[in-house]
Amino acid sequence: MTRYKAIISYDGHDFSGFQRQPHARTVQEEIEKTLVRLNSGQPVTVHGAGRTDAGVHAYGQVIHFDLAGSRDVEKLRFALDTQTSEDIDVVSVEQVADDFHCRYAKHSKTYEFLVDIGRPKNPMMRHYATFYPYDLDLSLIEEAIQDLVGTHDFTGFTASGTSVEDNVRTITVASMEYDQQRQFLIFTFSGNGFLYKQVRNMVGTLLKIGNGRMPVGQIKRILAEKDRGLAGPTAAGNGLYLKEIIYED
């Protein structure tokens, strides 16, 4: 068997997430169906580096899968790209070592989160940016977001009921830009890993701080007390994008 690594992008609106699940349309299953056709009907399992939720998008999701024999990677990419549904794009395919695992190989991830703060909102972007209808002081967000950078226990920003034992992660980039033309906020987070719904919970908290309903020092308190109840609401998934995954050599 030969192992292949692929970078894919997808519009998450019509998917129930990346991971295969009963009676639901998922990115994993769509790609597996195409690979089965390309593999003479033999089953193929696709592994993903990140398990995006329903409605979450990706520019740079990484997957891997095994096929019998060696194939021309550009022909394989083209076949996957043209035979998989139109809301999935196969950006690249390469052959990798048999022990490469896209999820467990050491890597960093970058997420973006788009927030529409326009008045009126942009209805064409309703599936691709989260609308926030309340007033914001962007200087408060810019001040608070810096407290997320560094190595912390992010228990206070993860969803309840998760089975992960170690909630310590390192965030290397946490920033916000204002796109004045589109009236969008663009949040960017890079790090060595993120907990379940961590990015959406961080954004929800930052928006509440910007609206003045939480103090600017709230993030420090959440990190110190590890209490999800101190954080803001979970921002909707439609504004979240898995932008890039970079593997260490």
Swiss-Prot record:
Q: What EC designation does it have? A: 5.4.99.12
Which CDD domains did the record assign? PseudoU_synth_EcTruA
Stored InterPro entries: PsdUridine_synth_cat_dom_sf, PsdUridine_synth_TruA, PsdUridine_synth_TruA_a/b_dom, PsdUridine_synth_TruA_C, TruA/RsuA/RluB/E/F_N
**Does the UniProt entry include the keyword tRNA processing?**
yes
Q: Catalytic activity annotated for this protein?
A: uridine(38/39/40) in tRNA = pseudouridine(38/39/40) in tRNA
Sequence similarity? Belongs to the tRNA pseudouridine synthase TruA family.
Cite the HAMAP family for this sequence: TruA
Protein name, UniProt field: tRNA pseudouridine synthase A
